[in-house]
């Protein structure tokens, strides 16, 4: 009976699609080619290719990418080890794939249809009959259920959090699998399940899954791992039998026959390798280098070009993170005092050629940001149970990060800092800031791993010393930095949280109370706030874009009020340099540049 019902549903979905009614609005019955978090997908069931990809892109050649850091595992799905880049996507696929011109819409990949109810308390995926792993074995519902169970029990903390919300998963037909989400009250969860990596049940030993390994995972994606030099490089080659090459979502993508990622432990070595042509495309993050260092012969000769790509995503939160698990940073007044000692104007002018903009929100650069916007009635309603969670100037939209005179010796910020320190029980004795009751000096360590981080930290430390703070910079290699970060073993460090136009479950992983004690989560600050948890819940249960924006802005206000980071800065555009042998489409996605849509010029 279940199989017959499923077939009837699929027939209904096909009829709706054919009539033009199959595109999802708030909700429509039946199976669909896509699912949007809010509203309906931009591309109908008959779409031919993504708007940002060129379906005529030539196939062939090799792309070499340079990565700063190292790796000691090819398994990106567990907390152990430093995984190599791009295993997910290149080798391992999910049920659905993102459309990168929309905030959060997923289109068919391993699954060719998705069906959910109005409450999104269940979701059913029907697998594409052509879907195969690289060894030729069919992808079936048992692989999907196996992946869910394995990642729920042994995966990274975010997987465990998300997939634990699923009550049950079961095969309902030869190609269909249904997830029961009853009680989750999480409208994003069907999409999160749609992005779940699907692993080959017959090729994985669950007892060894959490071990670091250089043995490639078997996947269903467009590439397979062809060579590994531990810590130095990973090579991928095209799977000539890739089952999904004709899918609409893939048209114009995956154009290289081979892709290699070379790893560099040092930023200068990384840049010099690009100048020599040892890798093809570089994302620049240093405005000083972008402004002055691209003067080498290949650029003058036109063999290298610099390009600036606009992107419509929130700019994320790049900040110096207070580990509030440390007693020294438990008092919010202390954190705010230190925020007042960061001289962005001096640093931006002297280090960054005034190219950066100051971060003033966890969702800067889009309508989700609360910066400069008074809270509306819906936000105030959400925040009413937490009257002390948001400070008045953040509630009315007048707050902005402290602005200095740019001299490097700003007295206004120093006075504000001393007033806050005094309120928190600290006083200046001679040239040292000490706790008045215990006499304990105010001292902490700032952990860094790159030269850029170290340079910023040293500049900040100079200003902290003016306030009598004994701040020390400790530089460690990438492996030690990652391990200490995972274990929350730091006082302060720099970190960047990326954001999307449809933030959701990952916010619990970033700021949720449960994540504060879960090693491997990204709640590096140790936020434990009922207000934060409630705003995340409101985001996840929002049924309209208006309610979603209100909940996200309310979350932004609570996080800003907590002074959990010293907000840093962001570039207004993506700075990309490439050797001209690599070409790209004329249209840029909402997410900016996408290397999977680029191609090698010699392949024409």
Where does each model-flagged region fall?
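Detector for C-terminal structural segments
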Residues: 10, 17, 30-34, 67, ...
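Surface-exposed binding/hinge segments that line
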Residues: 126, 160-204, 220-229, 374-386
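Ligand-site clamp/hinge motif
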Residues: 128, 211, 244-295, 336, ...
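Extracellular/periplasmic solute-recognition and catalytic clefts
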Residues: 168-170, 226-237, 262-326, 333-337, ...
